[in-house]
Amino acid sequence: LCQELFPIVQEISKSLKWDLEKNELNCVDIWTVINKKNSFNTSHIHKNSILSCVYYLKIPKDKKGGNLIIKDPRNVWEFFPRPTVLEDCSYNLKSTIGSVNHNPNELVIKPEVGKMIVFPSWLEHKVTQNLSEEKDSDRIALAFNVIENKCQQ
């Protein structure tokens, strides 16, 4: 599945004007995230990678399986108008995801089956509690990181 999703990551990198001739991107650290009823993931970052990706495989039908929250840890947004750094670094994240909540440095992303979210690995992120009341309430996602290798000249 990562091989099928990785071309999307490469397109995002091109849109960010990354030089893919000098820098090769590789998919690493692939894992499955299963959030059962009442489970959640605490705030964290992914060190030693440049992009983090999550692809939604299954969500509860009542859509209460938990949201992905991406937070820019730099508190300058409290004093200045919101720059487009989150949008630019996440392949037009604003139009892909929808509205941003009232906290200008935080995005709330509602999962959808088949949706992939790509964001800079240094951004703090977490998953809110799975509050689904369904019998089959698991929220399942595939996650992976992307690293950069310098190409030999």
What does each of the following model-derived ranges do?
Residues 31-118, 128, 136-138, 148-152:
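Catalytic core of non-heme Fe(II) oxygenases with the double-stranded beta-helix
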